UniProtKB/Swiss-Prot annotation:
Species per Swiss-Prot/TrEMBL record: Methylobacillus flagellatus (strain ATCC 51484 / DSM 6875 / VKM B-1610 / KT)
Catalytic activity, as annotated: L-glutamyl-tRNA(Gln) + L-glutamine + ATP + H2O = L-glutaminyl-tRNA(Gln) + L-glutamate + ADP + phosphate + H(+); L-aspartyl-tRNA(Asn) + L-glutamine + ATP + H2O = L-asparaginyl-tRNA(Asn) + L-glutamate + ADP + phosphate + 2 H(+)
EC number: 6.3.5.-
Self-association state and partner proteins as the record states: Heterotrimer of A, B and C subunits.
Name this polypeptide is given: Aspartyl/glutamyl-tRNA(Asn/Gln) amidotransferase subunit B
Family in the record: Belongs to the GatB/GatE family. GatB subfamily.
Function: Allows the formation of correctly charged Asn-tRNA(Asn) or Gln-tRNA(Gln) through the transamidation of misacylated Asp-tRNA(Asn) or Glu-tRNA(Gln) in organisms which lack either or both of asparaginyl-tRNA or glutaminyl-tRNA synthetases. The reaction takes place in the presence of glutamine and ATP through an activated phospho-Asp-tRNA(Asn) or phospho-Glu-tRNA(Gln).
InterPro entries per the UniProt record, alphabetical: Asn/Gln-tRNA_amidoTrfase_suB/E, Asn/Gln-tRNA_Trfase_suB/E_cat, Asn/Gln_amidotransferase, Asn/Gln_tRNA_amidoTrase-B-like, GatB, GatB_C_1, GatB_Yqey_C_2, Gln-tRNA_amidoTrfase_suB_CS
Amino acid sequence: MSWEVVIGLETHVQLNTRSKIFSGSSTAFGAEPNTQANVVDVALPGVLPVLNKEAVQCAIRFGLAVNAEIAPRSVFARKNYFYPDLPKGYQISQYELPVVGKGALTIQVGDTEKTIRITRAHLEEDAGKSMHGASPGQSGIDLNRAGTPLLEIVTEPDMRSAAEAVAYARKLHELVQWINICDGNMQEGSFRCDVNVSVRRKGQEKLGTRREIKNLNSFRFMQQAIEFETRWQIETLEDGGKIEQATVLFNPDTGETRAMRTKEEANDYRYFPDPDLLPLAISTEDIDAVRVTLPELPSAMKARFERDYGLSAYDASALTASRSVADYFTATLAEFGGEAKLVANWVMGGISAKLNEEGREITDAPVSPVLLAGLLKRIADNTISSKIAKDVFEAMWAGEGDADAIIERKGLKQVTDSGAIEAIVDEVLAANAAMVEEFRAGKEKAFNALVGQTMKASKGKANPAQVNEILKRKLAG
Protein backbone atom coordinates (compact mmCIF):
# COMPACT_ATOMS: atom_id res chain seq x y z
CA MET A 1 0.00 0.00 0.00
CA SER A 2 1.37 3.44 -0.94
CA TRP A 3 1.87 6.45 1.30
CA GLU A 4 0.24 9.87 1.40
CA VAL A 5 1.89 13.03 2.72
CA VAL A 6 -0.23 15.48 4.73
CA ILE A 7 0.94 19.08 5.00
CA GLY A 8 -0.22 22.16 6.89
CA LEU A 9 1.46 25.57 7.03
CA GLU A 10 1.93 28.22 9.69
CA THR A 11 3.15 31.46 8.13
CA HIS A 12 4.52 34.43 10.04
CA VAL A 13 3.80 37.62 8.12
CA GLN A 14 5.56 40.75 9.35
CA LEU A 15 3.07 43.60 9.11
CA ASN A 16 3.75 46.87 7.29
CA THR A 17 3.43 49.16 10.30
CA ARG A 18 5.73 52.05 11.12
CA SER A 19 5.89 51.15 14.80
CA LYS A 20 5.78 47.96 16.85
CA ILE A 21 2.63 46.20 17.93
CA PHE A 22 2.75 47.27 21.61
CA SER A 23 5.25 50.16 21.61
CA GLY A 24 6.18 53.24 19.62
CA SER A 25 9.58 51.92 18.49
CA SER A 26 10.36 51.89 14.77
CA THR A 27 10.12 48.67 12.76
CA ALA A 28 12.66 49.78 10.11
CA PHE A 29 15.02 46.99 9.06
CA GLY A 30 18.80 47.17 9.29
CA ALA A 31 19.38 49.60 12.17
CA GLU A 32 22.31 49.17 14.53
CA PRO A 33 21.58 46.54 17.23
CA ASN A 34 19.34 47.71 20.09
CA THR A 35 18.79 51.20 18.67
CA GLN A 36 15.08 50.51 18.07
CA ALA A 37 14.07 49.06 21.43
CA ASN A 38 12.40 51.19 24.09
CA VAL A 39 11.42 50.44 27.70
CA VAL A 40 8.44 48.31 26.59
CA ASP A 41 10.53 46.22 24.21
CA VAL A 42 13.21 45.49 26.81
CA ALA A 43 10.53 44.74 29.44
CA LEU A 44 11.51 47.17 32.16
CA PRO A 45 9.37 46.78 35.33
CA GLY A 46 6.11 48.72 35.39
CA VAL A 47 5.74 49.36 31.65
CA LEU A 48 2.46 48.56 29.89
CA PRO A 49 1.72 47.57 26.28
CA VAL A 50 -0.49 49.73 24.03
CA LEU A 51 -2.01 47.99 21.00
CA ASN A 52 -1.14 49.36 17.56
CA LYS A 53 -4.40 50.11 15.69
CA GLU A 54 -2.66 49.82 12.33
CA ALA A 55 -1.71 46.19 13.07
CA VAL A 56 -5.36 45.38 13.81
CA GLN A 57 -6.42 46.97 10.52
CA CYS A 58 -3.85 44.82 8.68
CA ALA A 59 -5.36 41.71 10.26
CA ILE A 60 -8.85 42.79 9.19
CA ARG A 61 -7.61 43.43 5.62
CA PHE A 62 -6.25 39.92 5.47
CA GLY A 63 -9.45 38.42 6.86
CA LEU A 64 -11.53 40.20 4.24
CA ALA A 65 -9.15 39.13 1.46
CA VAL A 66 -9.58 35.42 2.29
CA ASN A 67 -13.31 35.75 3.05
CA ALA A 68 -12.71 34.85 6.68
CA GLU A 69 -14.66 35.47 9.84
CA ILE A 70 -13.54 38.61 11.70
CA ALA A 71 -14.02 38.10 15.43
CA PRO A 72 -16.08 40.83 17.13
CA ARG A 73 -14.12 40.01 20.28
CA SER A 74 -10.63 38.53 20.48
CA VAL A 75 -8.19 38.15 23.34
CA PHE A 76 -4.43 38.53 23.70
CA ALA A 77 -2.70 35.81 25.68
CA ARG A 78 0.70 35.28 27.23
CA LYS A 79 2.69 32.43 25.71
CA ASN A 80 5.19 31.55 28.43
CA TYR A 81 8.65 30.24 27.64
CA PHE A 82 12.24 31.19 28.41
CA TYR A 83 14.68 32.24 25.73
CA PRO A 84 17.42 34.89 25.87
CA ASP A 85 15.83 37.01 23.09
CA LEU A 86 12.47 37.17 24.93
CA PRO A 87 13.06 39.68 27.74
CA LYS A 88 9.58 39.44 29.32
CA GLY A 89 9.79 35.66 29.66
CA TYR A 90 6.59 35.42 27.60
CA GLN A 91 5.35 36.39 24.15
CA ILE A 92 2.09 38.30 23.70
CA SER A 93 0.05 36.31 21.18
CA GLN A 94 -3.53 35.09 20.74
CA TYR A 95 -4.70 31.60 21.56
CA GLU A 96 -8.33 30.62 22.08
CA LEU A 97 -9.90 33.74 20.54
CA PRO A 98 -7.93 34.94 17.46
CA VAL A 99 -8.83 38.07 15.52
CA VAL A 100 -9.37 36.18 12.23
CA GLY A 101 -11.27 32.90 11.99
CA LYS A 102 -11.98 30.42 9.22
CA GLY A 103 -11.23 31.46 5.63
CA ALA A 104 -9.85 29.96 2.42
CA LEU A 105 -7.35 30.51 -0.37
CA THR A 106 -7.60 28.85 -3.78
CA ILE A 107 -4.40 27.65 -5.42
CA GLN A 108 -3.59 26.18 -8.81
CA VAL A 109 -1.12 23.35 -9.44
CA GLY A 110 -0.88 22.60 -13.14
CA ASP A 111 -4.44 22.53 -14.46
CA THR A 112 -5.95 21.65 -11.08
CA GLU A 113 -7.50 24.17 -8.70
CA LYS A 114 -7.70 23.40 -4.99
CA THR A 115 -9.06 25.31 -2.03
CA ILE A 116 -6.86 25.41 1.07
CA ARG A 117 -8.78 26.06 4.27
CA ILE A 118 -7.37 28.68 6.61
CA THR A 119 -8.00 27.78 10.24
CA ARG A 120 -7.15 31.13 11.81
CA ALA A 121 -4.87 34.15 11.74
CA HIS A 122 -3.77 35.77 14.97
CA LEU A 123 -1.75 38.81 15.96
CA GLU A 124 1.41 38.45 17.99
CA GLU A 125 4.76 40.09 18.66
CA ASP A 126 8.07 38.89 17.28
CA ALA A 127 11.00 37.99 19.53
CA GLY A 128 14.47 39.52 19.43
CA LYS A 129 17.47 37.98 17.73
CA SER A 130 20.44 36.12 19.18
CA MET A 131 23.79 37.18 17.71
CA HIS A 132 26.70 34.75 17.71
CA GLY A 133 30.31 35.22 16.70
CA ALA A 134 30.63 38.98 17.15
CA SER A 135 32.97 38.42 20.11
CA PRO A 136 34.91 35.17 20.74
CA GLY A 137 33.12 32.97 23.25
CA GLN A 138 30.23 35.41 23.64
CA SER A 139 26.72 35.80 22.27
CA GLY A 140 24.69 38.98 22.09
CA ILE A 141 21.01 39.88 21.89
CA ASP A 142 19.55 42.40 19.43
CA LEU A 143 16.08 43.54 20.54
CA ASN A 144 15.34 45.71 17.50
CA ARG A 145 12.99 43.00 16.21
CA ALA A 146 11.33 42.38 19.60
CA GLY A 147 7.73 43.57 19.45
CA THR A 148 7.54 43.74 15.66
CA PRO A 149 3.92 42.95 14.68
CA LEU A 150 3.26 39.55 13.14
CA LEU A 151 0.16 37.92 11.73
CA GLU A 152 0.45 34.15 12.06
CA ILE A 153 -1.68 32.44 9.41
CA VAL A 154 -2.51 28.78 10.05
CA THR A 155 -3.99 26.34 7.53
CA GLU A 156 -5.80 23.05 7.87
CA PRO A 157 -3.66 20.03 6.83
CA ASP A 158 -5.10 20.20 3.30
CA MET A 159 -1.98 19.92 1.14
CA ARG A 160 -0.89 16.58 -0.27
CA SER A 161 2.41 17.39 -1.99
CA ALA A 162 5.37 19.73 -1.83
CA ALA A 163 4.07 21.35 -5.03
CA GLU A 164 0.73 22.19 -3.37
CA ALA A 165 2.46 23.60 -0.28
CA VAL A 166 4.73 25.81 -2.38
CA ALA A 167 1.78 26.94 -4.53
CA TYR A 168 -0.11 27.94 -1.38
CA ALA A 169 2.92 29.78 0.06
CA ARG A 170 3.47 31.64 -3.21
CA LYS A 171 -0.21 32.60 -3.44
CA LEU A 172 -0.22 33.83 0.16
CA HIS A 173 3.04 35.73 -0.43
CA GLU A 174 1.48 37.42 -3.46
CA LEU A 175 -1.72 38.25 -1.56
CA VAL A 176 -0.18 39.89 1.53
CA GLN A 177 1.88 42.14 -0.73
CA TRP A 178 -1.12 42.88 -2.96
CA ILE A 179 -3.21 44.11 -0.03
CA ASN A 180 -0.17 45.97 1.33
CA ILE A 181 0.08 44.39 4.76
CA CYS A 182 3.60 42.96 4.24
CA ASP A 183 6.58 43.79 2.03
CA GLY A 184 7.15 40.07 1.42
CA ASN A 185 10.92 40.32 1.79
CA MET A 186 11.88 36.74 2.62
CA GLN A 187 15.59 37.49 2.98
CA GLU A 188 14.83 39.99 5.75
CA GLY A 189 12.43 37.60 7.47
CA SER A 190 9.20 39.41 6.60
CA PHE A 191 7.59 36.17 5.39
CA ARG A 192 8.57 32.94 7.16
CA CYS A 193 6.91 29.55 6.88
CA ASP A 194 6.77 26.64 9.31
CA VAL A 195 5.68 23.44 7.56
CA ASN A 196 4.01 20.56 9.40
CA VAL A 197 4.62 17.26 7.61
CA SER A 198 3.23 13.80 8.38
CA VAL A 199 2.65 10.67 6.33
CA ARG A 200 -0.02 7.97 6.43
CA ARG A 201 -1.13 5.02 4.36
CA LYS A 202 -3.43 6.00 1.49
CA GLY A 203 -7.04 5.51 2.49
CA GLN A 204 -6.26 5.92 6.20
CA GLU A 205 -8.18 8.72 7.94
CA LYS A 206 -6.07 9.09 11.07
CA LEU A 207 -3.22 11.57 10.71
CA GLY A 208 0.35 10.44 11.23
CA THR A 209 2.75 12.00 13.73
CA ARG A 210 3.87 15.37 12.42
CA ARG A 211 7.23 17.05 12.43
CA GLU A 212 7.44 20.82 12.03
CA ILE A 213 10.09 22.29 9.71
CA LYS A 214 10.84 25.76 11.09
CA ASN A 215 11.59 29.13 9.50
CA LEU A 216 11.73 28.37 5.80
CA ASN A 217 12.39 31.63 3.98
CA SER A 218 12.70 30.37 0.39
CA PHE A 219 10.19 28.57 -1.81
CA ARG A 220 12.98 26.44 -3.27
CA PHE A 221 14.14 25.41 0.20
CA MET A 222 10.53 24.66 1.16
CA GLN A 223 10.17 22.28 -1.79
CA GLN A 224 13.45 20.53 -0.96
CA ALA A 225 12.72 20.31 2.77
CA ILE A 226 9.25 18.79 2.31
CA GLU A 227 10.48 16.27 -0.25
CA PHE A 228 13.36 15.15 1.99
CA GLU A 229 11.21 15.02 5.13
CA THR A 230 8.55 12.99 3.32
CA ARG A 231 11.10 10.45 2.10
CA TRP A 232 12.71 10.24 5.55
CA GLN A 233 9.42 9.61 7.34
CA ILE A 234 8.33 6.92 4.85
CA GLU A 235 11.71 5.16 5.02
CA THR A 236 11.68 5.30 8.83
CA LEU A 237 8.22 3.73 9.04
CA GLU A 238 8.96 1.08 6.41
CA ASP A 239 12.10 0.12 8.36
CA GLY A 240 9.95 -0.45 11.46
CA GLY A 241 10.86 2.83 13.16
CA LYS A 242 8.61 5.36 14.87
CA ILE A 243 8.11 9.06 14.12
CA GLU A 244 8.52 11.29 17.17
CA GLN A 245 6.80 14.67 17.19
CA ALA A 246 9.60 17.20 16.83
CA THR A 247 10.69 20.58 15.56
CA VAL A 248 13.23 20.21 12.76
CA LEU A 249 15.52 22.51 10.79
CA PHE A 250 16.39 22.29 7.10
CA ASN A 251 20.03 22.49 6.04
CA PRO A 252 20.15 23.88 2.48
CA ASP A 253 23.78 22.79 2.08
CA THR A 254 23.02 19.10 2.63
CA GLY A 255 19.36 19.19 1.56
CA GLU A 256 18.41 17.38 4.78
CA THR A 257 16.26 18.05 7.83
CA ARG A 258 17.43 17.35 11.37
CA ALA A 259 15.58 17.33 14.68
CA MET A 260 16.20 20.40 16.84
CA ARG A 261 13.97 19.64 19.83
CA THR A 262 10.92 17.69 20.87
CA LYS A 263 7.82 19.51 19.66
CA GLU A 264 6.00 21.38 22.40
CA GLU A 265 2.26 21.17 22.94
CA ALA A 266 0.07 24.17 23.77
CA ASN A 267 -0.02 23.12 27.44
CA ASP A 268 3.75 23.56 27.64
CA TYR A 269 3.32 27.29 27.07
CA ARG A 270 0.75 27.79 29.86
CA TYR A 271 -1.34 30.26 27.86
CA PHE A 272 -3.54 32.65 29.81
CA PRO A 273 -5.21 35.99 28.95
CA ASP A 274 -2.82 38.95 29.24
CA PRO A 275 -4.09 41.05 32.17
CA ASP A 276 -2.42 44.18 30.74
CA LEU A 277 -4.52 44.18 27.56
CA LEU A 278 -8.29 44.49 27.30
CA PRO A 279 -10.14 42.17 24.91
CA LEU A 280 -10.02 43.52 21.36
CA ALA A 281 -13.47 44.65 20.19
CA ILE A 282 -14.04 45.05 16.44
CA SER A 283 -17.35 46.50 15.26
CA THR A 284 -19.08 46.16 11.90
CA GLU A 285 -18.21 49.81 11.32
CA ASP A 286 -14.53 49.05 11.92
CA ILE A 287 -14.64 46.25 9.34
CA ASP A 288 -16.50 48.39 6.79
CA ALA A 289 -13.94 51.19 7.21
CA VAL A 290 -11.17 48.75 6.27
CA ARG A 291 -13.21 47.12 3.50
CA VAL A 292 -13.41 50.36 1.48
CA THR A 293 -9.59 50.58 1.45
CA LEU A 294 -9.16 47.06 0.06
CA PRO A 295 -7.96 46.96 -3.57
CA GLU A 296 -9.49 44.72 -6.21
CA LEU A 297 -8.17 41.27 -5.36
CA PRO A 298 -6.05 39.20 -7.78
CA SER A 299 -8.75 36.60 -8.43
CA ALA A 300 -11.34 39.27 -9.26
CA MET A 301 -8.89 41.19 -11.44
CA LYS A 302 -7.90 38.01 -13.30
CA ALA A 303 -11.55 37.25 -14.04
CA ARG A 304 -12.09 40.83 -15.23
CA PHE A 305 -9.06 40.71 -17.54
CA GLU A 306 -10.42 37.53 -19.12
CA ARG A 307 -13.99 38.84 -19.36
CA ASP A 308 -13.46 42.46 -20.41
CA TYR A 309 -10.22 42.24 -22.39
CA GLY A 310 -10.53 38.76 -23.88
CA LEU A 311 -7.20 37.66 -22.42
CA SER A 312 -6.42 33.98 -21.93
CA ALA A 313 -6.36 32.50 -18.44
CA TYR A 314 -2.58 32.18 -18.75
CA ASP A 315 -2.09 35.85 -19.69
CA ALA A 316 -4.50 37.06 -17.00
CA SER A 317 -2.71 34.96 -14.36
CA ALA A 318 0.71 36.27 -15.38
CA LEU A 319 -0.47 39.89 -15.32
CA THR A 320 -2.03 39.53 -11.87
CA ALA A 321 0.91 37.65 -10.34
CA SER A 322 1.94 40.85 -8.59
CA ARG A 323 0.26 44.16 -7.84
CA SER A 324 3.05 46.16 -9.51
CA VAL A 325 2.79 44.20 -12.78
CA ALA A 326 -1.01 44.53 -12.79
CA ASP A 327 -0.74 48.28 -12.15
CA TYR A 328 1.82 48.65 -14.97
CA PHE A 329 -0.38 46.75 -17.42
CA THR A 330 -3.50 48.71 -16.45
CA ALA A 331 -1.73 52.08 -16.72
CA THR A 332 -0.24 51.18 -20.13
CA LEU A 333 -3.59 49.99 -21.47
CA ALA A 334 -5.34 53.16 -20.27
CA GLU A 335 -2.73 55.35 -22.01
CA PHE A 336 -2.66 53.21 -25.18
CA GLY A 337 -6.41 52.78 -25.62
CA GLY A 338 -5.94 49.92 -28.07
CA GLU A 339 -5.89 46.14 -28.03
CA ALA A 340 -5.24 44.64 -24.59
CA LYS A 341 -3.51 41.58 -26.07
CA LEU A 342 -0.79 43.76 -27.62
CA VAL A 343 -0.14 45.40 -24.24
CA ALA A 344 -0.10 42.02 -22.51
CA ASN A 345 2.40 40.62 -25.01
CA TRP A 346 4.82 43.49 -24.45
CA VAL A 347 4.51 43.50 -20.66
CA MET A 348 5.03 39.73 -20.46
CA GLY A 349 7.57 39.73 -23.29
CA GLY A 350 9.90 42.69 -23.84
CA ILE A 351 9.44 44.33 -20.44
CA SER A 352 9.66 41.09 -18.46
CA ALA A 353 12.73 39.89 -20.38
CA LYS A 354 14.66 43.10 -19.69
CA LEU A 355 13.67 43.11 -16.02
CA ASN A 356 14.84 39.51 -15.57
CA GLU A 357 18.06 40.22 -17.46
CA GLU A 358 18.92 43.17 -15.22
CA GLY A 359 17.40 41.94 -11.96
CA ARG A 360 15.03 44.92 -11.71
CA GLU A 361 11.52 45.31 -10.40
CA ILE A 362 8.89 46.64 -12.80
CA THR A 363 8.54 49.74 -10.63
CA ASP A 364 12.16 50.57 -11.60
CA ALA A 365 11.70 49.99 -15.34
CA PRO A 366 13.19 52.86 -17.40
CA VAL A 367 10.32 52.45 -19.87
CA SER A 368 7.24 53.79 -18.09
CA PRO A 369 3.65 52.87 -19.00
CA VAL A 370 3.36 56.18 -20.87
CA LEU A 371 6.50 55.47 -22.91
CA LEU A 372 5.44 51.90 -23.70
CA ALA A 373 1.98 53.10 -24.75
CA GLY A 374 3.64 55.56 -27.14
CA LEU A 375 5.53 52.71 -28.79
CA LEU A 376 2.40 50.55 -29.06
CA LYS A 377 0.54 53.40 -30.77
CA ARG A 378 3.17 53.45 -33.51
CA ILE A 379 2.87 49.69 -33.97
CA ALA A 380 -0.93 49.92 -34.11
CA ASP A 381 -0.97 52.73 -36.70
CA ASN A 382 1.67 50.95 -38.85
CA THR A 383 4.25 53.70 -38.43
CA ILE A 384 6.73 50.92 -37.58
CA SER A 385 6.73 47.15 -37.89
CA SER A 386 6.85 44.80 -34.92
CA LYS A 387 10.46 43.99 -35.82
CA ILE A 388 11.53 47.64 -35.86
CA ALA A 389 9.56 48.16 -32.63
CA LYS A 390 12.03 45.89 -30.83
CA ASP A 391 14.91 48.15 -31.88
CA VAL A 392 12.98 51.23 -30.79
CA PHE A 393 12.21 49.57 -27.46
CA GLU A 394 15.91 48.85 -26.86
CA ALA A 395 16.70 52.51 -27.50
CA MET A 396 13.91 53.61 -25.16
CA TRP A 397 15.23 51.28 -22.45
CA ALA A 398 18.67 52.85 -22.89
CA GLY A 399 17.15 56.27 -22.22
CA GLU A 400 17.33 57.66 -25.77
CA GLY A 401 13.88 59.26 -25.62
CA ASP A 402 10.31 58.38 -26.51
CA ALA A 403 9.24 56.27 -29.49
CA ASP A 404 8.39 59.18 -31.79
CA ALA A 405 11.73 60.90 -31.21
CA ILE A 406 13.71 57.69 -31.83
CA ILE A 407 11.72 56.78 -34.96
CA GLU A 408 12.22 60.27 -36.40
CA ARG A 409 15.91 60.53 -35.50
CA LYS A 410 16.80 57.09 -36.89
CA GLY A 411 14.50 57.20 -39.91
CA LEU A 412 12.65 54.03 -38.94
CA LYS A 413 9.19 54.77 -40.35
CA GLN A 414 7.64 51.80 -42.07
CA VAL A 415 7.39 51.84 -45.87
CA THR A 416 3.72 51.47 -46.78
CA ASP A 417 3.86 52.83 -50.33
CA SER A 418 2.74 49.91 -52.52
CA GLY A 419 4.77 51.07 -55.48
CA ALA A 420 7.98 51.26 -53.48
CA ILE A 421 7.42 47.81 -51.95
CA GLU A 422 6.54 46.34 -55.37
CA ALA A 423 9.83 47.63 -56.79
CA ILE A 424 11.76 45.94 -53.96
CA VAL A 425 9.84 42.68 -54.52
CA ASP A 426 10.65 42.75 -58.25
CA GLU A 427 14.35 43.11 -57.47
CA VAL A 428 14.24 40.22 -54.97
CA LEU A 429 12.40 37.91 -57.41
CA ALA A 430 14.85 38.72 -60.20
CA ALA A 431 17.83 38.01 -57.93
CA ASN A 432 16.40 34.76 -56.56
CA ALA A 433 15.09 32.87 -59.60
CA ALA A 434 16.01 29.49 -58.10
CA MET A 435 14.00 30.23 -54.99
CA VAL A 436 11.02 31.24 -57.14
CA GLU A 437 11.20 27.90 -58.99
CA GLU A 438 11.36 26.02 -55.66
CA PHE A 439 8.18 27.76 -54.50
CA ARG A 440 6.40 26.96 -57.75
CA ALA A 441 7.50 23.35 -57.30
CA GLY A 442 5.56 23.24 -54.03
CA LYS A 443 8.20 24.14 -51.45
CA GLU A 444 6.38 26.51 -49.06
CA LYS A 445 9.59 27.33 -47.18
CA ALA A 446 10.83 29.15 -50.26
CA PHE A 447 8.05 31.72 -49.85
CA ASN A 448 9.17 32.55 -46.31
CA ALA A 449 12.72 32.89 -47.57
CA LEU A 450 11.57 35.37 -50.22
CA VAL A 451 9.69 37.36 -47.56
CA GLY A 452 12.88 37.45 -45.51
CA GLN A 453 14.92 38.63 -48.51
CA THR A 454 12.40 41.39 -49.20
CA MET A 455 12.42 42.58 -45.59
CA LYS A 456 16.21 42.53 -45.63
CA ALA A 457 16.31 44.56 -48.84
CA SER A 458 13.98 47.14 -47.26
CA LYS A 459 16.14 47.21 -44.10
CA GLY A 460 13.13 45.94 -42.16
CA LYS A 461 10.99 48.95 -43.05
CA ALA A 462 8.55 47.38 -45.51
CA ASN A 463 5.09 46.62 -44.20
CA PRO A 464 5.11 42.80 -43.72
CA ALA A 465 1.44 42.37 -44.64
CA GLN A 466 1.93 44.26 -47.90
CA VAL A 467 5.10 42.29 -48.66
CA ASN A 468 3.16 39.04 -48.26
CA GLU A 469 0.27 40.24 -50.42
CA ILE A 470 2.47 41.54 -53.26
CA LEU A 471 4.70 38.45 -53.26
CA LYS A 472 1.69 36.11 -53.43
CA ARG A 473 0.20 38.08 -56.31
CA LYS A 474 3.40 38.13 -58.33
CA LEU A 475 4.23 34.47 -57.71
CA ALA A 476 0.73 33.46 -58.77
CA GLY A 477 1.05 35.39 -62.02
